[in-house]
Swiss-Prot record:
Gene: engB
Biological processes annotated in GO: division septum assembly
The protein's role, per its UniProt record: Necessary for normal cell division and for the maintenance of normal septation.
A cellular component annotation (GO) from this entry: cytosol
Cofactor requirements of the protein: Mg(2+)
Residue numbers binding GTP: 30-37, 57-61, 75-78, 142-145, 173-175
Official protein name in the record: Probable GTP-binding protein EngB
MF term (GO), any: metal ion binding
Domain EngB-type G: 22-192
Originating organism: Thermoanaerobacter pseudethanolicus (strain ATCC 33223 / 39E) (Clostridium thermohydrosulfuricum)
Length: 192
Protein backbone atom coordinates (compact mmCIF):
# COMPACT_ATOMS: atom_id res chain seq x y z
CA UNK A 1 0.00 0.00 0.00
CA UNK A 2 1.24 3.47 -0.84
CA UNK A 3 0.70 6.16 1.79
CA UNK A 4 -0.26 9.28 -0.17
CA UNK A 5 -1.74 11.55 2.47
CA UNK A 6 -1.54 11.58 6.24
CA UNK A 7 -3.36 14.11 8.35
CA UNK A 8 -3.36 14.47 12.11
CA UNK A 9 -7.14 14.76 12.42
CA UNK A 10 -7.51 15.40 16.15
CA UNK A 11 -6.70 14.43 19.68
CA UNK A 12 -9.83 13.42 21.58
CA UNK A 13 -10.29 13.42 25.33
CA UNK A 14 -13.96 12.41 25.33
CA UNK A 15 -16.51 10.71 23.11
CA UNK A 16 -17.91 13.96 21.69
CA UNK A 17 -14.52 14.70 20.12
CA UNK A 18 -14.29 11.46 18.09
CA UNK A 19 -14.59 11.86 14.30
CA UNK A 20 -18.22 11.71 13.18
CA UNK A 21 -17.69 10.17 9.74
CA UNK A 22 -17.97 6.42 9.26
CA UNK A 23 -14.45 5.68 8.08
CA UNK A 24 -12.86 2.44 9.30
CA UNK A 25 -10.51 2.66 12.27
CA UNK A 26 -7.38 0.66 13.03
CA UNK A 27 -6.41 1.07 16.67
CA UNK A 28 -2.90 0.87 18.13
CA UNK A 29 -2.75 -0.30 21.74
CA UNK A 30 0.01 -1.25 24.17
CA UNK A 31 1.91 -0.36 27.30
CA UNK A 32 3.53 3.01 27.76
CA UNK A 33 6.85 3.33 25.93
CA UNK A 34 6.31 0.18 23.83
CA UNK A 35 6.89 2.10 20.59
CA UNK A 36 3.41 3.07 19.37
CA UNK A 37 4.44 6.55 18.20
CA UNK A 38 7.63 5.20 16.63
CA UNK A 39 5.62 2.59 14.72
CA UNK A 40 3.26 5.28 13.43
CA UNK A 41 6.11 7.50 12.26
CA UNK A 42 7.99 4.60 10.66
CA UNK A 43 5.08 2.94 8.86
CA UNK A 44 3.66 6.24 7.62
CA UNK A 45 7.17 7.47 6.71
CA UNK A 46 6.71 10.71 8.63
CA UNK A 47 9.48 11.77 10.97
CA UNK A 48 7.62 13.64 13.70
CA UNK A 49 3.94 12.99 13.05
CA UNK A 50 3.43 11.19 16.36
CA UNK A 51 5.45 12.72 19.17
CA UNK A 52 7.98 10.30 20.63
CA UNK A 53 9.76 10.43 23.95
CA UNK A 54 12.05 8.22 25.99
CA UNK A 55 9.77 9.10 28.91
CA UNK A 56 6.58 7.02 29.05
CA UNK A 57 3.19 8.73 28.99
CA UNK A 58 3.77 11.16 26.09
CA UNK A 59 0.46 10.32 24.37
CA UNK A 60 -2.36 11.47 26.63
CA UNK A 61 -5.34 11.86 24.33
CA UNK A 62 -6.72 9.49 21.71
CA UNK A 63 -5.00 10.59 18.51
CA UNK A 64 -6.71 10.12 15.15
CA UNK A 65 -4.60 10.10 11.97
CA UNK A 66 -6.48 10.18 8.66
CA UNK A 67 -4.69 8.01 6.10
CA UNK A 68 -5.28 8.55 2.35
CA UNK A 69 -8.70 10.00 3.29
CA UNK A 70 -9.83 6.34 3.61
CA UNK A 71 -9.36 5.24 7.22
CA UNK A 72 -8.14 6.38 10.64
CA UNK A 73 -5.15 5.08 12.49
CA UNK A 74 -6.07 5.58 16.16
CA UNK A 75 -3.29 5.90 18.73
CA UNK A 76 -4.47 5.17 22.27
CA UNK A 77 -2.54 6.32 25.35
CA UNK A 78 -0.23 3.66 26.72
CA UNK A 79 -1.26 1.80 29.82
CA UNK A 80 0.78 0.56 32.77
CA UNK A 81 2.86 3.70 33.35
CA UNK A 82 3.55 3.96 37.08
CA UNK A 83 4.77 7.57 37.37
CA UNK A 84 1.48 9.37 36.90
CA UNK A 85 -1.17 10.07 39.50
CA UNK A 86 -3.88 7.52 40.22
CA UNK A 87 -6.39 10.05 38.95
CA UNK A 88 -4.55 10.37 35.61
CA UNK A 89 -4.33 6.57 35.27
CA UNK A 90 -8.04 6.33 35.98
CA UNK A 91 -8.79 8.97 33.35
CA UNK A 92 -6.64 7.23 30.71
CA UNK A 93 -8.27 3.86 31.49
CA UNK A 94 -11.71 5.45 31.21
CA UNK A 95 -10.83 7.11 27.87
CA UNK A 96 -9.43 3.86 26.42
CA UNK A 97 -12.39 1.82 27.63
CA UNK A 98 -14.92 4.36 26.34
CA UNK A 99 -13.32 4.45 22.91
CA UNK A 100 -13.07 0.67 22.58
CA UNK A 101 -16.64 0.13 23.73
CA UNK A 102 -18.30 2.90 21.72
CA UNK A 103 -16.48 3.00 18.38
CA UNK A 104 -18.74 1.60 15.68
CA UNK A 105 -15.95 1.82 13.09
CA UNK A 106 -13.22 -0.19 14.78
CA UNK A 107 -11.99 -2.80 12.29
CA UNK A 108 -8.59 -4.04 13.47
CA UNK A 109 -6.25 -3.80 16.44
CA UNK A 110 -2.48 -3.54 16.34
CA UNK A 111 -1.44 -4.77 19.74
CA UNK A 112 2.15 -3.76 20.54
CA UNK A 113 4.41 -5.65 22.94
CA UNK A 114 8.13 -5.06 23.51
CA UNK A 115 9.79 -8.24 22.21
CA UNK A 116 12.05 -8.31 25.31
CA UNK A 117 9.20 -8.24 27.85
CA UNK A 118 6.62 -10.73 29.06
CA UNK A 119 2.96 -9.76 28.64
CA UNK A 120 1.37 -8.11 31.66
CA UNK A 121 -2.07 -8.57 33.17
CA UNK A 122 -3.17 -5.45 31.25
CA UNK A 123 -1.93 -7.03 28.01
CA UNK A 124 -4.04 -10.12 28.68
CA UNK A 125 -7.09 -7.99 29.43
CA UNK A 126 -6.66 -6.11 26.15
CA UNK A 127 -6.16 -9.27 24.04
CA UNK A 128 -9.18 -10.89 25.69
CA UNK A 129 -11.26 -7.80 24.91
CA UNK A 130 -10.44 -8.12 21.19
CA UNK A 131 -11.20 -11.85 21.26
CA UNK A 132 -14.48 -11.28 23.12
CA UNK A 133 -15.56 -8.66 20.54
CA UNK A 134 -14.47 -10.92 17.65
CA UNK A 135 -12.35 -8.07 16.33
CA UNK A 136 -9.33 -9.00 14.24
CA UNK A 137 -6.03 -8.07 15.83
CA UNK A 138 -2.34 -8.52 15.17
CA UNK A 139 0.35 -8.68 17.83
CA UNK A 140 3.31 -6.50 16.85
CA UNK A 141 6.51 -7.36 18.70
CA UNK A 142 8.43 -4.08 18.78
CA UNK A 143 12.12 -3.27 19.28
CA UNK A 144 13.19 -6.45 17.45
CA UNK A 145 16.61 -4.93 16.72
CA UNK A 146 17.37 -5.32 20.45
CA UNK A 147 17.38 -9.16 20.27
CA UNK A 148 19.05 -11.78 18.08
CA UNK A 149 17.21 -14.04 15.63
CA UNK A 150 16.86 -17.01 17.98
CA UNK A 151 15.49 -14.78 20.77
CA UNK A 152 13.11 -13.29 18.24
CA UNK A 153 11.86 -16.74 17.14
CA UNK A 154 11.40 -17.79 20.77
CA UNK A 155 9.46 -14.59 21.56
CA UNK A 156 7.09 -15.31 18.66
CA UNK A 157 6.59 -18.93 19.78
CA UNK A 158 5.95 -17.80 23.36
CA UNK A 159 3.43 -15.12 22.33
CA UNK A 160 1.57 -17.60 20.11
CA UNK A 161 1.32 -20.07 23.01
CA UNK A 162 0.46 -17.49 25.66
CA UNK A 163 -2.28 -15.77 23.65
CA UNK A 164 -3.36 -18.90 21.74
CA UNK A 165 -2.89 -17.27 18.34
CA UNK A 166 -1.38 -18.33 15.02
CA UNK A 167 2.04 -17.23 13.75
CA UNK A 168 0.30 -15.21 10.99
CA UNK A 169 -1.17 -13.00 13.72
CA UNK A 170 2.28 -11.82 14.85
CA UNK A 171 4.56 -9.23 13.23
CA UNK A 172 8.17 -8.73 14.25
CA UNK A 173 8.86 -4.99 14.05
CA UNK A 174 11.96 -2.81 14.17
CA UNK A 175 11.81 0.88 13.27
CA UNK A 176 15.61 0.95 13.06
CA UNK A 177 15.75 -1.86 10.49
CA UNK A 178 12.35 -1.10 8.90
CA UNK A 179 11.39 -4.69 9.70
CA UNK A 180 7.66 -5.45 9.66
CA UNK A 181 6.66 -2.24 7.86
CA UNK A 182 5.31 -4.03 4.77
CA UNK A 183 3.22 -6.39 6.94
CA UNK A 184 1.63 -3.46 8.79
CA UNK A 185 0.94 -1.73 5.46
CA UNK A 186 -0.74 -4.94 4.24
CA UNK A 187 -3.15 -4.68 7.17
CA UNK A 188 -3.85 -1.03 6.29
CA UNK A 189 -4.56 -2.01 2.70
CA UNK A 190 -7.52 -4.14 3.78
CA UNK A 191 -9.31 -1.01 4.99
CA UNK A 192 -8.14 1.56 2.42
Amino acid sequence: MKIKTVEFARSAFNEEQYPKDNLPQIVIVGRSNVGKSTLINTVLNRKNLAKTSSRPGKTRGINFYLINNKFYLVDLPGYGYAKVSKEMKKQWAHNIETFLNTSQNLRHGLFLIDIRRNPTEDDFLMINWFKHKNLPFTVVLTKADKVNKSESRKAVEDICKIFKINREEVIIFSALEKMGVSQVLSIFEKYA
